[in-house]
């Protein structure tokens, strides 16, 4: 076999490894090309919102989507607190990194931090980067509580997010 042909096949195997790594750690693109749908009721928001410049959580100016149907529905039991009601997703790549574990959508998840109005202000957690699935974890390793129970692992508490 000629060295030129050998080099070609060698480059193919490198590309194959890179492709496998890329497929394993798919990253979402921000800003989102399409408005996300609410994972609770499938509503597609008409507008993208911007966090107030006076936000105390360090999120001033960040873009995000909420579901107005779930936000105003008094009977919505999915979110028990007002600050979570109707939340869909941030529309930026803050906290999204190729080394993050994958969520239930198969894309890398987002590392985030609970706001000051939450029951655990400042607590780190993992969530779906685009809000498409219900993935959420307060574990350092990103496993859900069900996955941790299945693995019979010792519980690990919350963590301080590295990105803040």
Residue ranges and their predicted role:
Residues 2-164:
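Intrinsically disordered, low-complexity linker/tail regions enriched in polar/charged residues
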